[in-house]
């Protein structure tokens, strides 16, 4: 059918083509003697691909929104016993390519208490005059790799909100950890953490942070307050395959903007004041709670018999927009990402006009529709089953003042093509 999906599954002998989505999905090589030559070949492929993406996406918003998938004809037959060795080789090649790429690098983390500032220039094609200042710092010390928290601030004056983020980041009891605390580049209509220029920043952050080697790839967390609550709820769903857990606070998105099914396999905390009526935040948080509870009842366990929708969504009694912020990150830190889930639920939707090119170990080679597509994958006894459906939303509740679509019905039809 037209809706083609590429998956990876373990078998004794197999051929896998090197592919690149946001990070890495590749395994190659079968002989130790040829290892260095193959690693150089793979590194050069990665580097050229990164340069192509950089050239295309920084010059054209359309190119960034298309999110082109790159492939290669590099192939080698490998045996099961050599998989780990070749995974390391490919990862090393990926890291080398990223270090050689000419781009603004992520600052070296210092003690977060110092408040050392750095910044990235985001592509002009995605947002004019967009400079993203950030703090990138470490809390405490520990042997090995650290969890990374991405904190998104609220929509007050951006300098003040950013400074508050640094104070909160140092205060929260989640160390040892790393913190990335960005400042919104532009206010007004661009004061949204989910727009394409910011997507560029998040993908760059994840890519560069993992390459540096001091971040635990399975302990990435996103959370935020108010506007940052809206943003982190959207990013939780859109990038769920990268997070261990997510924690919006004092927000509330219509669920068309953040489908809950995508948050299967991660921890999800959502805290809002019970009396936070602005933009219907308390009502939309309640609708999110109902949706997660319903998803949990419908699919309580994944294919490995593990809980699929672990969530904590509470309306805090007697509180309005200001709530207890310290409750979120200690809860999030308990979660470790499962990089190879055997149950994947994914509603593929656009965020600011841009779709993902893949999700976990699924890669979309061609989509059956330009609209939304829902993928339900289960792996059992090395058999992969994928159901693909087209999704249609119908609004069943709108607010009378702003016309916000509050609730929806969804209908599903089998994908064709």
Predicted segments, located by residue:
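Bacterial N-terminal signal peptides that target proteins for export
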Residues: 3-18
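A domain-start/cap signature at the N-terminus of enzymes
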Residues: 34-146
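Bacterial N-terminal signal peptides
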Residues: 17-26
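Gly/Ser-rich "nucleophile elbow"/oxyanion-hole loop immediately N-terminal to the catalytic nucleophile
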Residues: 139-144, 190-226, 240
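Alpha/beta-hydrolase-fold serine-hydrolase catalytic core, especially in secreted/extracellular enzymes
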Residues: 35-73, 293-417
